[in-house]
Amino acid sequence: MKFVVAILLAAIPSISICKPLPPRDMPAVEVSESPTVDGDISDSAWQRPPDCTEFFHRETGAAAAEKTSAWVCYDSKFIYVAFRCEESKPDSIRAAQKKRGGGLDRDDYVRVDIDPWHTHLFMYTFKVNARGTQTEEIPGVGGTKIEWRGDWLAAAKIQPYGWSVEMAIPWSILKYPSNQSVMGIAFFRRHSRTDQIWSSPDLGPSDDEQLMLNWTNLKPPPPVLITTALAYVNAGWGGDSLKAGLDVKKQLSQQKNALLTINPDFQSIEQNVESIDFTYSPRVLSDNRAFFTEGNAHQSNESRMFYSRSIEDVDVGLKIVGQTGGNDFSGLFCTSGSDDQHLYLKSRWDFGQVNRIGAAITSTRRPGIENQVGSVFGRLGRRSENRTDYIEYSLMKSLTPGSGGDGSITRLGGSGYGGPKEIGWWLYYNNINPSYYAADGIVPDPDLKGISYGANYGNEYSSGRIRQWSVDVSGHSWDLHSGELLSKSLWMSANVASLNSQIYASFGREKRRDEVESIPTLFNDHTFTIGCAWNQQEMYTRGWADVSFGKRAGGNSFYGRVKQGLSLGESFHADIFYEYLRMTGPFAQREHQVVASLAYDITSENSLS
């Protein structure tokens, strides 16, 4: 603990609140004749000089290899955006993704980021590939239903010089204060042939929002408040054959949303399938249910005081989320009966892009269980054009009537990361008291104190056979509160990637205490992993495979897995994932698992799977 504090205190002089850079203004253009969103940028709105023509490589700051032009204008209903993307090798234009909301990371695409509050904190992101497929990121919005997220228009067209895009983003999607005359805006293009992202202006490898253009002289329409209701009926065989439910989302203000769910349709939501690979501790899995993801109420670290996947059924749920200036808050209450109730409240204040403080509480009532947990947390750091470094802390305290269940978790540490040829690092001290208990939370290791650490370094190249490489070193040293060793590890890994393939390898050693037939045992593990990936530029036929082998938990261990995408026609696509585990010794087992998915694209917005 003293060692960690000394290092972090030494870093404080260089980790300070960074001053905003001088603003770059771009006057807004209001149009009386709206452009037609068909991908053809011959409309009169785009015949003036472009707003942006200088694009820069995200990682190095070098000028973009191909010319790109971007325009933006608006009227009383929409924000209109256009891109002209020149391509000297038009046959290389890649636009495989056809499903709206699908990943565009391997395609040629353009993107616009809008900061309506001009606080450099909450970005709206809109992407369109060269086929016209759309995807967006709306701050604090969960779920995938367009009715829930808000609709917008886009189209793309292949041109003799390359390709072009038009977008129409309704003002009603954005949240902004009345009489807002300045917003932040930035433009991006991904070039698949070089696997580069270019931006205008140059935001650096960390997409520093403080460097966004100031879109000035705006006269947006008065903000509107929207209420959305989605009702559903599920029919089935056996047991309850009919179930009806209702989801309602209401904007209380431009900064606050309320959500009500009654008999939510959780069973039709695909959750992540847990791996069969051996682990000493429970895995922390993500939750795809929109009621829980809306507002990003979950904590990001592994020891979570609120872990929504522990709540399986909900009869009625109410949630309020929002942002007020630099304050981000959420409140959640749900119940599946009078004796099963869950409450979660969280508030966070952001000061700049990195610095923050906050607090949270949970309260759980189940048959035979009554439990409360409180938390305070904070972060102080510095973000520059090339990297971000910060120190942070969190303290959680649990209260449970009766004996036991009154403990705490303390976490103190720091982290730093940047672009190519920048050293990444992290160092944390964790103290998890064995008396700590969170009925709606998860703690993979409920009794430990010690440090975890790591560092990485790598580089990227715009041409050549090797496009990226990196090396990583990480480890931890954890003791039980009794003073006995819980776990001590050291891992090393390396990765080399070309434009379309990847090879990676790692080796690690760990001493780990666990129980075998209620007898504490100290295992000496060592594991090798080697893997590769192929067709990484292909949307539907890419794949990867790796194997891990060595000693684990007192026996020999072998674990292998492979994933392959298949294109079965213009509209049929499949993914097959297979994993196999074989172990000897106290935890001897032999298991395998196949996860297969088949999708048929009916339209760009609807599919059967």
Predicted stretch roles:
Residues 18-344, 348-349:
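Structural preference for beta-rich elements and adjacent junctions enriched in aromatics
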Residues 77-79, 122, 163, 179-183, ...:
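Outer-envelope beta-barrel architecture signal
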Residues 275-279, 376, 411-412, 442-444:
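Short secondary-structure boundary/capping segments
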Residues 202-222, 338-374, 379, 383-384, ...:
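Outer-membrane beta-barrel transmembrane domain signature of Gram-negative proteins
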Residues 85-87, 116, 169-171, 189, ...:
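Short beta-strand segments enriched in hydrophobic/aromatic residues
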Residues 313, 388-609:
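Exposed, low-structure sequence patches enriched in small/polar residues
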Residues 234-236, 245-247, 263-267, 334-337, ...:
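Conserved short loop/turn motifs at secondary-structure junctions
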Residues 5-17:
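Hydrophobic h-region of N-terminal signal peptides that target proteins for export
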